[in-house]
UniProtKB/Swiss-Prot annotation:
The J domain is necessary and sufficient to stimulate DnaK ATPase activity. Zinc center 1 plays an important role in the autonomous, DnaK-independent chaperone activity of DnaJ. Zinc center 2 is essential for interaction with DnaK and for DnaJ activity. Disulfide bonds: none annotated. Zn(2+) 2 binds at C161, C164, C187, C190. CXXCXGXG motif repeats lie at residues 144-151, 161-168, 187-194, 201-208. This is Chaperone protein DnaJ. Belongs to the DnaJ family. Participates actively in the response to hyperosmotic and heat shock by preventing the aggregation of stress-denatured proteins and by disaggregating proteins, also in an autonomous, DnaK-independent fashion. Unfolded proteins bind initially to DnaJ; upon interaction with the DnaJ-bound protein, DnaK hydrolyzes its bound ATP, resulting in the formation of a stable complex. GrpE releases ADP from DnaK; ATP binding to DnaK triggers the release of the substrate protein, thus completing the reaction cycle. A zinc finger (CR-type) spans 131-213. Gene3D superfamilies: DnaJ domain, Heat shock protein DnaJ, cysteine-rich domain, Urease metallochaperone UreE, N-terminal domain. GO terms for molecular function: ATP binding; heat shock protein binding; unfolded protein binding; zinc ion binding. GO terms for cellular component: cytoplasm. Homodimer. Its cofactor is Zn(2+).
């Protein structure tokens, strides 16, 4: 039995879009197959989380799920179902009253669009930022090259189904408190095609499609983010009876970076500096997505001060320009001190007291003088 989608992601039913996305990203990184090779349990949890996110991240699907639960996406449910649920029961009744040969008897299943496919592609933080090209191997159903999708052996042709007489449906009479009602269902003999293949194609066993692995080049645009869904029209599975192919959806999974974090098009990082650098000022080599750049630290910098490097963030996916990089400096407290350094630190405390009482040189002026003495040790 399927678990509640909100329970799967660990969010409340009132969770907003960002909370749902954040919860999914956490689970996806934890259970992704690339992180847990050979772990079937992790793979199932990853699939479960992805299925839940697919529904809850879509406003329309989420509304249907909130109203009907999992049955909203069960193709076997009648009525207003989702994901393949049809209106067969209503169509039968409409045909009975408005023509259509009584119970939809004249309808035939025509060309059918191929299934859409999903492919999860893992890329690095840098590849997401600047874009990349990848070749992926996609297993899919393709039109049989031997019979060209007809399902019949070369030189033969399908014949009319003898069970449904080419209609693609068989009738059934149901007795109800309101009297007998005639309905129709898909013909089980021909699967709704209205045709019978007496000499199936040996290559595809009469299905009209064969399983192939297709190499597809995927272009990831600059500025892509985790969870981005890229659509490649016509690269899904082949359609049936001349129907169009489905689409391929490539969902990006961006690996976490060991140094950078991303919010929108801005990147964030944290750099430790020494007490000396904070007091006297310094120039640092700061890692960016473009390599190291110089950044000045002014005298008297406090811990947790954030500096901005303009234009060193993520490129905008639509339009020109880039976000910024935010650098948070953290003053590291020394843990191993020499006797001389301890002596100087005690003098710092005395300087502070003297400053308050005498109003002479500022604290940082005294600190800088004493630090310079310590450097000369």
């Amino acid at each position: 039995m399927k678990r509640d989608y909100y329970e799967v992601l660990g969010v409340s039913k009132s969770a907003d879009e960002q909370e749902i996305k954040k919860a999914y990203r956490k689970l996806a990184r934890q259970y992704h197959p690339d992180v847990n090779p050979g772990d079937k349990d992790a793979e199932e949890k990853f699939k479960e989380a992805t299925e839940a996110y697919d529904v809850l991240s879509d406003t329309e699907k989420r509304a249907r799920y909130d109203q009907m639960g999992h049955s909203a996406f069960d193709p076997n449910q009648q009525g207003f179902g989702g994901f393949g649920g049809d209106f067969g029961g209503f169509g039968d009744i409409f045909d009975m009253f408005f023509g259509g040969g009584g119970g939809g008897g004249q309808r035939r299943q025509g060309p059918t669009r191929g299934n859409d496919l999903r492919y999860d592609l893992t890329i690095t933080f840098e590849e997401a930022a600047f874009g990349t090209e990848k070749e992926i191997q996609v297993p899919r159903q393709e039109t049989c090259t031997e019979c060209h999708g007809s399902g019949s052996a070369p030189g033969t042709h399908p014949t009319t189904c003898s069970q449904c007489h080419g209609t693609g449906q068989v009738k059934a009479t149901q007795r109800t408190p309101f009297g007998a009602i005639q309905t129709a269902r898909t013909c089980p003999a021909c699967n709704g095609s209205g045709q019978f293949i007496s000499s199936p194609c040996k290559e595809c066993s009469g299905k009209g499609t064969t399983r192939k692995v297709k190499t597809i080049k995927v272009t990831v645009p600059p500025g892509s983010e985790d969870g981005l869904n890229l659509r490649f029209s016509g690269n899904g599975e082949a359609g049936l009876r001349g129907g169009p192919s489905g689409d391929l959806y490539v969902v990006l999974n961006v690996k976490a970076h060991k140094f950078f974090e991303r919010e929108g098009n801005d990147v964030y990082c944290e750099i430790p500096i020494t007490f000396v650098q904070a007091a006297l000022g310094s120039e640092l080599d700061v890692p960016t997505l473009d390599g190291k750049v110089k950044m000045k630290i002014p005298e008297g910098t406090q811990t947790a001060t954030v500096f901005r490097l303009r234009g060193h963030g993520i490129p905008y996916r639509r339009g020109n320009g880039r976000g910024d990089q935010h650098v948070r400096v953290v003053v590291a407290t020394p843990t191993k001190l020499t006797d001389r350094q301890k002596e100087l630190l005690r003098e710092f405390g005395e300087v502070t007291s003297d400053q308050q009482q005498m109003g002479k040189k500022s604290f940082f002026e005294k600190v800088k003088e004493n630090i310079r003495d310590a450097i000369d040790l």
